Amino acid sequence: MVKSSSYSSCSSYSSSSSTSRASSSSRRLEYPPGPHSILPNKLLREFINNPIKTLMEIAYTYGDIAHFKFGRQHVYLLNNPQYIEDILIRNYKTFIKSRGLQVSKRLLGDGLVTSEGEYHDRQRRIIQPALHLDLIKKYGDIMTSFALNMCQRWQDGITLDIHKEMIEITSAIISKAVLGSNIKSEQGGGVGDALLTCAEYFNRLLMPFGELIEKIPILPINKGFQRAKKKLDSIVYNMIKEHRENESRNVSNTDLLYTLLQAQDTEAGIGRMTDSQLRDEVMTIFLAGHETTANALTWTFYLLSQHPNVEARLYEEICTVLGNGNADSSSGGDGGSSSIKTRIPTVEDVPKLEFTEKIFRESMRMYPPAWTIGRQAINDYKVDKYVIPAGSIILMSQYVMHHNPRYFSDPDIFYPDRWTKETKLHLPRFSYFPFGGGIRGCVGEPFAWMEGILLIATICQQWKMHHDASHKVELKPLITLRPKYGMRMKLERRS
């Protein structure tokens, strides 16, 4: 099992919660408790080496709010759902996004992930309706079609990196969903390859001394990024041009780009997006829409390989929902061979795959693809009795909150059955937030849920995975929570 930090107690947590904007004051600030060292940058080095372990230890030791410094930078870690809700929903205008996402401007321009203020709010009003569940259901067949092609390519008994496979399939799916049936196969492949290059580039920039990379243009990684960006720009702008020409000829499309091209902000009386705005939003959807889901699926398959009883119940549900019967396993009910003939899952099956949904939800609790959210205060801000000064960095970690025993008993145990309707109803809103929340929450959340459930059902319908015991599993928390060394799995075909 992958090693991870955990709370051993939550006795240090306070239940009080009060946040608000605060005025600047000349009085000496009272800081919350937190780790301090006489050695400069000691904590920063610990955070760079193992950020999740560091944040977990701080949360366990100091409770709902902790203060520490990275060099001269004041940092606050919030571990209370109410505090997080106040920042992400009620007082979001008091904060801007932290450096990690600003780095992405190199590719994304002023897309939803990187933009701020009124421009961000306007773009969100334009884009969010295009990603509503009722509109994205039409992409379900694309998801299962790519999954089937991948399953047919696999061979029984081989060992492969399932993380790489998930990156490739989610890249292909998002390319097809956004750019549609008119995209050529070589263009789709080009999008996937270029996205991988860009994702790796941004992850490198966020590593220690990553800012130095940009200052040496001749480095291969910089040249590779520029080539990938140029390729993506060429494909996206050409597709925008083609879609506009089709529109002028009254030829409609069913892809997301066509929907975005039609969208406008009726509330503000602002017309359609320009080519440049469309380009930025398409790039944002590309980058945000493949790696997070790929990581979530990778961790899901890993957890299933470690819990054969859960995997067996998953396969039984698949057979019941998609085959009108129960799995008749010749291997003693362990999810092995089955005589049940099953059909391909559809969007209409998603609500019926209840245990599949619980598995995906629990996987994202244990290994949230977006493992922390950072904000920078642009004004002084009050949390409980403490004033957070303008310029401070605020961290709100999904990983930390999702492993808090106050909200999840035995948080280090993979237990999909914890997700009862009653549990989901009574959990504080930001005790579980794999997709963020508020005005800056992930607009693609419905797409991700549908994609995750359909891919799990389609793949596990045909294959069982066994984790390579010789393969080391370790967390790699960069922009998203990746497996550091990939995820080696041996494939077993169901017959």
Regions found by a protein language model. Give the residues of each.
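Cytochrome P450 heme-thiolate "Cys pocket" and heme-binding signature region
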Residues: 283, 288, 347, 421-452, ...
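Short, small-residue alpha-helix embedded
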Residues: 293-305, 455
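Cytochrome P450 heme-thiolate monooxygenase catalytic core
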Residues: 28, 96-104, 115, 119, ...
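C-terminal helix/juxtamembrane-tail motif
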Residues: 482-495
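Conserved cytochrome P450 K-helix E-x-x-R motif and the immediately C-terminal K′/meander segment
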Residues: 41-63, 234, 238, 342-384, ...
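Conserved cytochrome P450 K-helix/beta-meander segment immediately N-terminal to the heme-binding cysteine loop
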Residues: 396-423
